[in-house]
């Protein structure tokens, strides 16, 4: 039997989810990618940071509750600067001030209940984005599986599942890790991306199947 967990993630200061194609300007996704949420769950559960095998057991959805204010700041990073032959350089980094998200995580009921307890009492300190981007996890609930057909959803939407008619953003988010089997070993060789429509609410051209979590309609 499966169940779905819903939790609220409040960022008290700021956070940033770097888009990897940027170089001198580190732009940010408007929501934490699926891989970032899995990292949060791994920290709560005490899973090894290089063990991604549990991703196959979970389906993850993200709800944008409050986008936060986007600002630009400068950060010094350690990198060889040829101009003055020092190990430093400045990059412009976008940050999101006090955004609020919700996550939905579906899986086997026992595992979901274990994750829910871990989010309330995490094994490691929790962050969202960079290691010093503090996050507060609130309102952790577990729901039974309940589906509905709807033209209005409250979560981000995989690009291939529907077409929004209201204003949205489209981003290609990291959703998992590519692995290669080498004998008895599995090595992680890259990152898998998927297109997502992103908005706080979406009105769609056609009804699609979604999960009911209280009043929220979520696509995983």
List the predicted regions and their residue ranges.
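N-terminal, Lys/Arg- and Ser/Thr-rich interaction peptides
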Residues: 1-23
């Amino acid at each position: 039997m499966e169940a779905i967990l819903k939790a609220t993630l409040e960022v008290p200061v700021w956070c940033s989810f770097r888009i990897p194609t940027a170089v001198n300007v580190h732009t940010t996704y408007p929501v934490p990618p699926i891989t970032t949420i899995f990292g949060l769950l791994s920290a709560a559960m005490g899973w090894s940071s290089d063990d991604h095998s549990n991703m196959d057991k979970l389906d993850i959805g993200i709800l944008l509750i409050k986008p936060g204010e986007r600002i630009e700041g400068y950060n010094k990073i350690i990198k060889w600067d040829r101009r003055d032959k020092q190990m430093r350089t400045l990059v412009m980094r976008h940050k999101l001030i006090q955004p609020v998200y919700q996550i939905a995580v579906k899986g086997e009921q026992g595992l979901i209940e274990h994750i829910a307890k871990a989010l309330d009492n995490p094994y490691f300190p929790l962050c969202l984005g960079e290691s010093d981007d503090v996050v507060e996890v609130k309102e952790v609930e577990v729901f039974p599986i309940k589906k509905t057909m709807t033209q209005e959803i409250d979560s981000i939407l995989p690009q291939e599942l529907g077409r929004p008619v209201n204003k949205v953003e489209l981003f290609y988010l990291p959703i998992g890790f590519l692995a290669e089997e080498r004998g008895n070993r599995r090595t992680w060789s890259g990152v898998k991306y998927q297109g997502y429509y992103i908005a706080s609410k979406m009105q769609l051209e056609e009804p699609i199947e979604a999960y009911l979590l209280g009043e929220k309609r979520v696509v995983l």
